[in-house]
């Protein structure tokens, strides 16, 4: 049985396709193009003719504007890393354009790579001394410094001069993460690398260096310390005074345990604290065994205990049994099947050799 073809309905997408009051709306006429190729050509020819017939004074006024735009585009194309290589570069280059600073950086890097000490001194000496006042830690677009170029080229004299003037190398790396000493070693100049590493190479000012921790005295431990973690150390926690403790307080450790015997052998008396002068905590710190790989707080923590296993209990040193892999199980099953087949064959041969 054939079904009649259904008429598909296409929704209107244009206001002119709509029907209004039983009548279809008229189609709007397409606007004709008011500009053809000949008219556009005539317009541009007239524009060019007006520029060529302009007076010389107007042309001289437009040329500096074009030159300024061209210079502005050339400056904007310079890498931002070269413009703000370091804060010191900005201080040394005050009053100097970015383009001049870029040229100065390349001159310094080239002089350092070629080992030209007179040119290097002229570029790095301050203006008061008759030099160019260049930055000794200037960087190019690849973050190479003069010290890196001199070390990579094996120019020992230039490296010694730059280090003597305070060139930084500690923590100063190029884009690949290599410093001046590593570049010298890769190029086959171990003497230059050793010269760099034996220098100071401090990149931080003295006021920004982290102060050395001062020596402090702990009354509870009766000792001097410099470590900031001393307050949370086990020795300090055991020495903390918890007030007078009754002498018959149970220690929580059996008398037969090796730890208790070591305490007695060291001069400790039962009922006294565990500190250096027999004061502080009288009981050991309870602990919780951690023998799984689950994260902390994954399950509720068990009860802390001082002694987890009785004496001579092998569970104290027993490791966690590793479940066998699938390959190991398959290999064992195969060995068991082969052994069973060999036993069956042996029994069969024995049975057939019997004489009744």
Curated annotation (Swiss-Prot):
GO molecular function, one term: nucleic acid binding
Basic residues composition bias: residue spans: 67-76
SS bond partners: none
Domain of life, source organism: Eukaryota
Keyword match rRNA-binding: no
Each ANK repeat, start to end: 111-141, 142-172
Coiled coil: none
InterPro entries reported for this sequence: Ankyrin_rpt (IPR002110), Ankyrin_rpt-contain_sf (IPR036770), G_patch_dom (IPR000467), GPANK1 (IPR039146)
Entry keywords, A to Z: ANK repeat, Isopeptide bond, Repeat, Ubl conjugation
Protein name: G patch domain and ankyrin repeat-containing protein 1
Organism expressing this protein natively: Homo sapiens (Human)
Source species taxonomy: Eukaryota, Metazoa, Chordata, Craniata, Vertebrata
Gene: GPANK1
């Amino acid at each position: 049985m054939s079904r009649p073809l259904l008429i598909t309905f296409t929704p209107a997408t244009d206001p002119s396709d709509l029907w209004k009051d039983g009548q279809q709306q008229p189609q709007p006429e397409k606007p004709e193009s008011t500009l053809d190729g000949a008219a556009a050509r005539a317009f541009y020819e007239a524009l060019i003719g007006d520029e060529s017939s302009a007076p010389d004074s107007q042309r001289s006024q437009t040329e500096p504007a074009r030159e300024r735009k061209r210079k502005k585009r050339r400056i904007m194309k310079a890498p931002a890393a070269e413009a703000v290589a370091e804060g010191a570069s900005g201080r040394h280059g005050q009053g100097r354009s970015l383009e001049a600073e870029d040229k100065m950086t390349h001159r310094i890097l080239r002089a350092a790579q070629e080992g030209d000490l007179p040119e290097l001194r002229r570029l790095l000496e301050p203006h008061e001394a008759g030099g160019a006042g260049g930055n000794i830690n200037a960087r190019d677009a690849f973050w190479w410094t003069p010290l890196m170029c001199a070390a990579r080229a094996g120019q020992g004299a230039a490296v010694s001069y730059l280090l003597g003037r305070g060139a930084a190398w500690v923590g100063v790396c190029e884009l690949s993460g290599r410093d001046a000493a590593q570049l010298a070693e890769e190029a086959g100049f171990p003497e230059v690398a050793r010269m760099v590493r034996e220098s100071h190479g401090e990149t931080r000012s003295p006021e920004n260096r982290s102060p050395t921790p001062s020596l402090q005295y702990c009354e509870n431990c009766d000792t001097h310390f410099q470590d900031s973690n001393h307050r949370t150390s086990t020795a300090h926690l055991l020495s903390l005074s918890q007030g007078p403790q009754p002498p018959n307080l149970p220690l929580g450790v059996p008398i037969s345990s090796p730890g208790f015997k070591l305490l007695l052998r060291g001069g400790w008396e039962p009922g006294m604290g565990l500190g250096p002068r027999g004061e502080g905590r009288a009981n050991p710190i309870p602990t919780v065994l951690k023998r799984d790989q689950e994260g902390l707080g994954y399950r509720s923590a068990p009860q802390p205990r001082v002694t987890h296993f009785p004496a001579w209990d092998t569970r104290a040193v027993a490791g966690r049994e590793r479940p066998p892999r699938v390959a190991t199980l398959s290999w064992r099953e195969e060995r068991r099947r082969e052994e069973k087949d060999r036993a069956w064959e042996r029994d069969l041969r024995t049975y057939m050799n019997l004489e009744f």
